[in-house]
Amino acid sequence: MKIVILDGYTLNPGDLSWAPLEKLGDLTVHDRTDAHEIIPRATGAEVVFTNKTPLAAETIRSLPELRYIGVLATGYNVVDVDAARTAGITVTNVPTYGTHAVGQMVFALLLELCHHVQHHSSEVKRGRWSQGPDFCFWDFPLVELAGKTMGVVGFGRIGRRVGAIADAMGMRVIAHDPYAADPPGYAEFAFVSMDDLLKQADVVSLNCLLTDENRGMIDADALRAMKPTAYLINASRGG
């Protein structure tokens, strides 16, 4: 069985082993694959793995031996799933690997906005603090999150993780998700409409997959509805 990985470097830059897959068949790993290289490299393969290399309908139809596509990420948006279904090809993803990492990234971005850590670190290294007239040094106001409102759009695994971190930091948490009904045990929590979330939140964290229903939901009107001081963190995925 021929197995092809189209963009292995994004998943394994050298710290993991491909040995388990090598036991299943004739494995070829490409670090990166441009669009014009997909068909030549995948021709004859029964199994193709991709992380971010797109597999469009035309490409899938050009690979008659293909029986399985493994998306090495959560979003299916890089694969034309309808074309794969028509061709009888199974498509799978990895739905839960990034829950904690994405939650952490949301707050890494947010804390940088609140404290400008990189800027102040660079300025301290330049000597501005030691040369300054005061013990305290800052170029921007430092924003405290405790007591502020975190608005989570999309309250699945990642959204709930973001909410849990916000709760631990003393924030009030509100969420909008038309498909979620089970409230968490945070100190302060409420499901609200999207309009109310935009109006109330000091931080809006987008943690949903892209669908036809929510495409373009953060438009000019949505931005105008937010507080002038609010932060918008986009941690969504393509599909």
Q: Positions of the model-derived regions?
A:
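N-terminal glycine-/charge-rich "phosphate-binding" loop or analogous flexible N-terminal tail
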Residues: 1-47, 172-174
